[in-house]
Design a protein with these regions (language model features):
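Proline-enriched interdomain boundary motifs that mark the N-terminal boundary
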Residues: 1-9
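A short beta-strand segment in extracellular, disulfide-stabilized domains
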Residues: 16-27
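Solvent-exposed loop segments of extracellular immunoglobulin-like
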Residues: 27-37
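Surface-exposed, flexible coil segments in extracellular/virion-facing regions
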Residues: 39-58
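Short, solvent-exposed loop/turn segments at the edges of extracellular beta-sandwich modules
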Residues: 74-80
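C-terminal edge beta-strand
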Residues: 83-93
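Conserved positions within compact, well-structured domain cores
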Residues: 94-312
Length: 312
């Protein structure tokens, strides 16, 4: 047989998520038919130990952990050796929270928790809206692992996040990918958060020492801390903002990196040079720093905000 077996399988998923996969990539010189077998030693993929067929659909376990599945291909005639391929998935669950209220996004039925800081209501979860349909796809889940966005949210380019519109002023950001009545935070919105969390006014371009520790959450991934340990940032989450180290994408969703190392979130205010900012938390420092990049290459997380009076 020639070729390599390949099948789509998520790197990360949530407990109880339904997974569907289709295998391809192998041919025989004689063109003889192939048969496929799916096997897992640690997941219940069917009533039997083995699933026969080119596709598979099953539900991931209810317990967090790392699980694997192997698919085998062989020629029905028996004239060629078999080929196999194995993939693993990290199944995740978390109950990290921080709630003033709940908001239902009418576009897709997703429910978000929010909390009031200063003059604004802030989502305490990352946005996970994927667009109205396949033709208007917005953002991507980390490593293209659909389902993980239920915990981590999606990563968006600045243009996807904001609709390409810069914002300014308190509560003056563009709706972008956020629900109606909510917006992508401006520089002034972020400064208002810093004042509410830290108790003193901070310029947007400052490093925001100490704030990163107060807004990053000690999330666990299958029983282990997701943020690597550092005495310089204990991720106390004392302000219940629930910052997770969800990483970023590069090359317009072409590569993914920095999960469990960085958490990053957009601001909607473009500078005079056409560059756009995101704030970030690094596991090894207690700051909530800022960096500027272009509008398309990087993908980071989004928090949505609204003036708190709008929710009354």
């Amino acid at each position: 047989m020639s070729g390599t077996l390949s099948f789509d399988f998520p790197s990360y998923a949530v407990v109880g998520q339904k997974v569907e996969s289709y295998v391809s990539g192998i041919t025989t010189p004689s063109g003889s038919d192939l048969e496929y077998f799916w096997v897992s030693s640690d997941m219940d993929i069917s009533d039997n130990d083995t699933v026969i067929g080119q596709s598979i659909s099953f539900t991931l376990p209810a317990d967090p952990g790392e699980y694997s599945i192997t698919v085998y291909a062989r020629s029905i005639s028996g004239e060629y050796y078999s080929s196999s391929s194995t993939a693993s998935v990290q199944v995740i669950s978390t109950d990290a929270d921080g709630v003033t209220g709940r908001y239902t996004d009418v576009r897709d039925g997703e429910i978000y928790h929010y909390r009031t800081y200063g003059s604004l209501d802030w989502f305490t979860q990352n946005l996970r809206y994927s667009g109205a349909d396949a033709d208007t796809l917005l953002g991507r889940p980390y490593d293209d692992s659909e389902g993980i966005d239920q915990i981590f949210g999606r990563l968006y380019s600045w243009s996807d996040a904001t609709g390409g519109v810069s914002g300014s002023g308190l509560g003056g950001g563009p709706q972008g990918a956020c629900p109606e009545g909510w917006s992508v935070p401006t520089v002034e919105d972020w400064e208002d958060l810093a004042l509410a969390v830290g108790g003193s006014a901070l310029d947007f371009l400052d490093h925001w020492a100490g704030i990163g520790e107060m807004v990053s959450a000690p999330i666990t991934l299958n029983g282990s801390a997701m943020w690597p340990y550092s005495p310089d940032n204990l991720h106390t989450n004392t302000r219940d903002w629930n910052g997770f180290p969800t990483g970023n994408s590069r090359d317009h969703y072409g590569e993914y990196e920095n999960i469990a190392v960085y958490g990053m979130w957009w601001a909607s205010t473009e500078n005079a040079d056409g560059m756009v900012p995101y704030r970030f938390i690094f596991y090894n420092t207690d700051t909530f720093d800022v960096y500027y990049t272009d509008k398309e290459s990087y993908g980071v997380s989004v928090r949505c905000v609204r003036l708190s009076s709008q929710g009354q």
